[in-house]
Amino acid sequence: MDLFEYQARDMFEAHGVPVLAGIVANTAEEAKAAAEKIGGVTVVKAQVKVGGRGKAGGVKVAKTADEAFEYAGNILGMDIKGHTVHKVMIAQGADIAEEYYFSVLLDRANRNYLAMCSVEGGVEIEVLAVERPEALARIAVDPAVGIDQAKAEEIVDAAGFAADVLDGVIETIKKLWDVFQKEDATLVEVNPLVKTGDGRILALDGKVTLDANADFRHPDHEALEDKDSADPLEAKAKENDLNYVKLDGEVGIIGNGAGLVMSTLDVVAYAGESHGNVKPANFLDIGGGASAEVMAAGLDVILNDAQVKSVFVNVFGGITACDAVANGIVKALEILGTSANKPLVVRLDGNNVEEGRRILTEANHPLVTQAATMDEGADKAAELAHAAK
C-alpha cells in the first residue's frame, strides 16, 4: 500500500525523523486555517500517489494564508496523471541550502535490502541513475543487521557527504531505517532530504510503501487506506478476499491461479483483435477453493462493471475438481438471480472435467455456453462482447 505524503510525514514524525509542520486539508477554507496556524511562508502540496506534481501545478508556495486559500482552491479537484486531488497538505516553508536523496527498499532481484543515497537530491532519481549513475550510491543492507551506526557511516561515506552534515544525516538515516523495519515497509524514500540555512537536516518529502502481507501485525495500517480514491469494484473484491484488478476492456475474466488468469488475459486480447478489438476487463483470481460463495462473489464484482459485456470463466481443476467448480457456477447463478444478466463462457479442464461439463449441460442455464479449449472460450467470449457493444 502506497501512502500519501502527509501520511508518510506523520509516520516519520512518530519515529523521530526530523520533519517540518504539515497539516492536511480537504477544502480551501481548511487550507487557509492551516496556513494561519503554521504561520509564515507555507507550501500547498497536492496529495496524490504519483510523481510530477510540481510540473503539473500541484505544488505552490504561499506567502500568506489568503494565497494558500487561492492555491488550494485551484489544486483541489485537479487531475494529475489520472489521479484526482482530494486533499492538499499545507507544509511549513523551509530555507533550503542543500538537497540530498535517500531511500531504502526491498531488493527483490538480490533477495536483500538496498539503500540508495546521493548528495544530489530534489531531482528525478530515475534520470540521475541513468545519466549519472556514479552520483547514486547503492549499498546492500543485511536484513539481520539493518542500518546501524556502522552501516549508516558506510552509506554517507559512499555518497560523499560533507563533514558538517555527517552526524545529522547519519542519525536521520538510522531513524528512516526504523520506519522501514518497524512499519514493515518495502520502500521508504526521502527526496529531498535537505540541509537548511541554519544547518538542520530535514525530510521534506517522503514516500512509503507498506507490505500488505504484514497487515496482521499492524491493525493501525487499515486507517491509512485511501477509501475515497479506491475503485469501488476493487474495494468490493477486497472485502471478499478476491485478487482483482480492474482493466479497461469488455470481457470479464475469472480463473483459478494467477498464471492461468494471466494467460487468459493474453488469449482474450488476441481473440479480441478479430472481434472489434475487445479486450479483457479485469484480472480476477478466485484461487483454489472455487466454492459457490466465492464464484458468486467473483461474478457479482464483474457483473457490476458496466464495461463488461461478456464473462469468460476459465478453470483448470486440480485440488478443486471441475465438478465442484461447475456446482459453484450453477449455485452462484442461482444466488445472483436477475443480476446475472451477461453471457458466460465456461471452459473447464483437468480433474473430473467430464462430470463438471455434465453438471453445466444439465443445468442448461440460458446465459452459459461451454467451450472445450481456452482458445475456443476466448474467441466465443470476445465474439459475444463485440456483439453486445
UniProtKB/Swiss-Prot annotation:
> Which reaction is the catalytic activity of this chain?
succinate + ATP + CoA = succinyl-CoA + ADP + phosphate; GTP + succinate + CoA = succinyl-CoA + GDP + phosphate
One GO term describing the cellular component? succinate-CoA ligase complex
EC number(s) per UniProt?
Answer: 6.2.1.5
Q: Does the keyword Ubl conjugation apply?
A: no
Question: Which Pfam family is an annotated match for this chain, by its short name?
Answer: Ligase_CoA
Biological-process GO terms, alphabetical: succinyl-CoA metabolic process; tricarboxylic acid cycle
Enzyme class, spelled out:
ligase
Quaternary structure, per UniProt, is:
Heterotetramer of two alpha and two beta subunits.
Task of the protein: Succinyl-CoA synthetase functions in the citric acid cycle (TCA), coupling the hydrolysis of succinyl-CoA to the synthesis of either ATP or GTP and thus represents the only step of substrate-level phosphorylation in the TCA. The beta subunit provides nucleotide specificity of the enzyme and binds the substrate succinate, while the binding sites for coenzyme A and phosphate are found in the alpha subunit.
Q: What name does this protein carry? A: Succinate--CoA ligase [ADP-forming] subunit beta
Q: From what organism does this protein derive?
A: Renibacterium salmoninarum (strain ATCC 33209 / DSM 20767 / JCM 11484 / NBRC 15589 / NCIMB 2235)
